[in-house]
Amino acid sequence: MTLPESKDFSYLFSDETNARKPSPLKTCIHLFQDPNIIFLGGGLPLKDYFPWDNLSVDSPKPPFPQGIGAPIDEQNCIKYTVNKDYADKSANPSNDIPLSRALQYGFSAGQPELLNFIRDHTKIIHDLKYKDWDVLATAGNTNAWESTLRVFCNRGDVILVEAHSFSSSLASAEAQGVITFPVPIDADGIIPEKLAKVMENWTPGAPKPKLLYTIPTGQNPTGTSIADHRKEAIYKIAQKYDFLIVEDEPYYFLQMNPYIKDLKEREKAQSSPKQDHDEFLKSLANTFLSLDTEGRVIRMDSFSKVLAPGTRLGWITGSSKILKPYLSLHEMTIQAPAGFTQVLVNATLSRWGQKGYLDWLLGLRHEYTLKRDCAIDALYKYLPQSDAFVINPPIAGMFFTVNIDASVHPEFKTKYNSDPYQLEQSLYHKVVERGVLVVPGSWFKSEGETEPPQPAESKEVSNPNIIFFRGTYAAVSPEKLTEGLKRLGDTLYEEFGISK
């Protein structure tokens, strides 16, 4: 079947994007790699002055039989060295990125070897439905999001965001004068019917939204994941009202099976054979990218949560038309993701291969399932057993939430003036005093408003007295996690006057 080309969405580009002209120097940088050219065109330091001749690494060996967190031993270790230069391709069978190239200016889209691995990975994970898609390396999803705002948004423009969303993403938008208008969510993520209602009732004269920013899987902060059938409905709404979908997916591969409360049933499920690659791929949530027939989706992926945050390396997948202004922006801002990072990640992935990388991702699923189960077990054990305290076991990501009906607090009306956020702040400080940090949900709340404003019904909250706290099971040992949640439970028992 012949796939269509993507649509042209350049009419959504920002004034900055439309004003930016390509750097003339970047048009000739490719000639630096031509051995027939004496390159006198740019201030590129001589590679002889790079004070590193090689980079040697020990990394675990697929299929990681002892688990991905096990110490690396001689039997389960890959040792390799990446050199500054190679005489020819035969001297570089692993397709490493030479240090002389990785540490030089150029290749703002990313090093070709790494991009080729990512393209192959993308074909395995996503069912792409238009032909002119490509990938562009980034310095992680924070950089990718900041670039997206600059490519598409002017001051005063409006974007749609989940009612509670990653605070740094909201702050990035607000710092650029972009209005973040909240869309209602529930335990299954964005509610399509309410999104449609927001758009149907959009105030005439208010700027129309250009983007919908969403964290579909293991959402930060709520831990929710958008159900597949909802994604289809959301995509159709985006088509109808002509906005782009920015799919921020750092937690996509931290998907898990649903939480099983009964320990015997859980042990039975865990005793079943380990998933093979095909089963793993089939179990993954459908993506907005796989639904996209027009180039309307901009997907942001990152190695931060699957390899290490300090790599500061990720990629954007989108149409070549949309990626072009990103490249022009990066040529004048980040130049390129760090060369050492690209060398290290590419060398590891090329030796693992696509199958080995899937083995790693399967290992992550196993580890995070254990961590999630530990957290939810402790919450059910130590939190008050009351309808006022709701736990939503996540099926992906690093976060859980405890939803609390503030109105049941005995001093809600007197001490806290019926203000749920006064109680939230008080509880936050009480929990910290007990030596535990969980984060108030209000820190992630989007409260942007357009001018003229949107109708009141578009901003209604189902129960304004519900507050929540976000915790993570990613950062500490099971023992510390359990103790921390016990202290959280003790605080709630005491503050709400509930006897154990």
UniProtKB/Swiss-Prot annotation:
One of its GO terms (molecular function) is pyridoxal phosphate binding. It is found in: Cytoplasm. GO terms for cellular component: cytoplasm. The modification Phosphoserine is found at S100. Pathway: Amino-acid biosynthesis; L-phenylalanine biosynthesis; L-phenylalanine from phenylpyruvate (ArAT route): step 1/1; Amino-acid biosynthesis; L-tyrosine biosynthesis; L-tyrosine from (4-hydroxyphenyl)pyruvate: step 1/1; Amino-acid biosynthesis; L-methionine biosynthesis via salvage pathway; L-methionine from S-methyl-5-thio-alpha-D-ribose 1-phosphate: step 6/6; Amino-acid biosynthesis; L-lysine biosynthesis via AAA pathway; L-alpha-aminoadipate from 2-oxoglutarate: step 5/5. It holds the Pfam family Aminotran_1_2. Its cofactor is pyridoxal 5'-phosphate. Its main location: cytoplasm. This is Aromatic/aminoadipate aminotransferase 1. It comes from Saccharomyces cerevisiae (strain ATCC 204508 / S288c) (Baker's yeast).
